[in-house]
Amino acid sequence: SAASDVYKRQVQMDGDGQHDPAYLMEVVQPVLDGVYDMCIGSRFIKKEGFQTSFMRRVGIRWLSGMIRLLCGKRVLDVTSGFRATNLAMTAYFAQHYATDYPEPEAILAASLAGFRVGEAPVIMRERQGGVSSIHSFKSAYYMIKVSLALIIDRLSIRKVKGGRA
């Protein structure tokens, strides 16, 4: 498993072509340096490259606000699937990773468990293939479901102060 000692750091990239491997070290370096346990590649820090549709940006902002409200952590690109983790974070996720809305729920769970979560600027491209799980006519329903999942997660995860779970 990725949580074994063989793999000290892990990288996740979506398979839809949005994530440019040229930015891999921007995402990995803060984990290598011990700054973060999980570093997320964010398209919204520099606001360059593909920024996604207006409605999706509104939804991402909403979820970002929910996460900040529920755990006090500010993350701009809460739906980014471009992330790096260290061994401790990966071991935690091996036991506690959400399957419904993994990107935003993982941020909330990691933050509540006392892990250091941060972002690094990347430039993303438009989706090269596949279909988004968020469709325009289902966006409101999706936002309600994710918001409720985050609230339920917050109620079920005990916040760790000054340490890791």
Residue ranges of model-derived segments:
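Cell-envelope/extracellular polymer assembly enzymes that use nucleotide-activated donors
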Residues: E105
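Acceptor/aglycone-binding surface of glycosyltransferases and processive sugar-polymer synthases
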Residues: S1-S4, R9-V11, P21-D100, R127-V146, ...
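Catalytic donor-sugar/metal-binding loop of nucleotide-sugar-dependent glycosyltransferases
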Residues: R74, Q95-A98, L108-R125
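The conserved acidic donor/metal-binding loop of glycosyltransferases
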Residues: D14-Q18
